[in-house]
Amino acid sequence: MGWAQLHAAGAGPIVYGHHHVNATDLAAHKRFWANTLGGVPTAFGQSEMYKFPNVHVFVREREPTGGTKGSAVNHIGFRVPSVRAVLGKVRAAGFPVVTRQELPSGMAVIDDMAYIDNQDTYIAFVMAPDNVKVELVEDRDQEEAIALHHIHFDTNDVDAMKAWYVDTFGAIPGTRGSFQAADLPGVNLTYSGNPAALEGTEGRSLDHIGFEVENLEAFCRQLESAGVEFDVPYRELDQLGIAIAFFTDPFGTYIELTEGLDKY
């Protein structure tokens, strides 16, 4: 399997697949996802796609209603061998580094990086175009230049949201540092409590998240029997060789299910 394919595909019946971004400026997003972070640009249907290990980032030209902050998905995370090195690229490209603004005032931030003791790693936050918040997590033993690490949800009910993803997708419950979390092949799903009223993701800069599913048609029937109402029912896109379905989780996250995206 190639560098930028879904490495976790085949590691389980459900793996993480993609992020889908609404963009006001496609060129700016290309500078961020490809030129700065190193995603491999690929044409795909009506969207541009940037391939990273374990995630494809789709970008389409559509005015977003807001950034990731304030929605059910606060940010997305990538792991890198050196946070400092990636921050240098981000600054050189002119994108904002927002580590200090995004962490509690009592947490030490030096050179735009913070050491997280209970995870024994350094992190930083940067802002992609259209206010897509991105966390960088250091993994010094990582051989790849960059790979998907986590999706960080905000929710009014951490326990309920975590349980829903465990029950629905078979994610393995656990923790990540001080956060409640659950794991699927290729991704950590992280949950933070937020008492504020949170917007759904559909229409915002991170419009939806995506999972790659084996036997998708049967899985959709299973979800329907459990009470899930689909915004877009299961259908096959013969021209792309994939199948898709869309629904919204009980907490406002718009979700696409795919089968066949792992071939790209």
Residue ranges: model-predicted function:
Residues 56-58, 196-197, 229, 263:
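Active-site/binding-pocket entry motifs
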